[in-house]
Amino acid sequence: MRKVFSGIIVASVVMFFLAGSWTSAQAAPITVRTVSAWSKSAQFETQQFLELLDMIQKEANQKYPGQLVFDYKGAGEVIPTQQQVEALRSGLVDMVLTAASYYTSIMPEMDVMSLTTMTPWEERKAGVDAYLEKLHNAKANAHYLARMGSGDLFHIFLSKPVQKIDDFKGMKIRVSPTHIPFMKDLGVEPVVTPPSEIYTAMERSVVVGYVQPVASIRTMGLLPVTKYMVRPGFYQPIVLVLMNLDFWKKLPDNLKKLLTEGMEKGEHMEMDKIAEKIKFELGEFKKAGVSTIELPPADAKKFTKMADDALMGVVLKKSPEDGKKLYELITKK
């Protein structure tokens, strides 16, 4: 009985995603089944992404009526966050908005992108996109569409203060996989949980802090359990839009052009909005009583070097050639 029930559940999930999917035998519209790593109610990047899809949809309706439809299925409640790129690779979904750190099991070199100091269009000009396209084609059966979420940095947020770098030793802090090596070097005990569980972990003192970008704290509802933000920040949150490669290849040229140009516009829009967003959010932090802790200059310098060295050390062990090449490409000459 249990096996029958499990089979029904699996079949239901598959049918949920196959509903409205596009095959070569079907007529238009082509339906793009889409998921995101974060919910639209909690994450700034998801909200901006869905606004962008709406903009592209309107342009498609005007230029190519009846040819393209975006079907947003949801976030981690539909497919667990760290399984979404695997779902994309297999063709269960057609497009994902995700973070590079969520699929390093497939592509460990993607962590290098957290060290970029370029804008997405500078990366395109420098050959970064072309190299990422090659890697995603080969390793994830994916087409690299765009990089969103630029300009923000990760920070450590705490419920109790620190004064120097040694004070982090022994702390339990919620992190994403990318942050684990650095946190361990700081003496932190890293805890990995889904983003939706950070509030509960803080409220119940399972952790005394978490690592997140500035723009997402308030919308995730974390201000009530947050007292301190530590500077300097480290690593850019690398938010990407990927499409299943087989799906991409089947698209007619007019829709490929529409999507490519629309996503490039979205990159510029995101950069403009994130600067305003960060300024606004820092003001909201003050209103909520969140204090900023600036590490002493010597500690701050050590902190930044430890962060960069920890990340590159791991990447070069797992993917020496691609990791080194990617780092060279994102480093401004």
What are these regions (language model features)?
Residues M1-A11:
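Bacterial N-terminal signal peptides that target proteins for export
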Residues I9, G20-S21, L251:
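Prokaryotic Sec-type signal peptides and long signal-anchor helices
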Residues S12-V13, Q43:
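Alpha-helical transmembrane segments and their juxtamembrane interfaces
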Residues M15-A25:
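C-terminal segment of classical bacterial N-terminal signal peptides
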Residues A27-M118, E122, N137-A138, A142-K333:
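N-terminal secretory/targeting leader peptides
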Residues K125-A138:
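Signature of the catalytic double-stranded beta-helix
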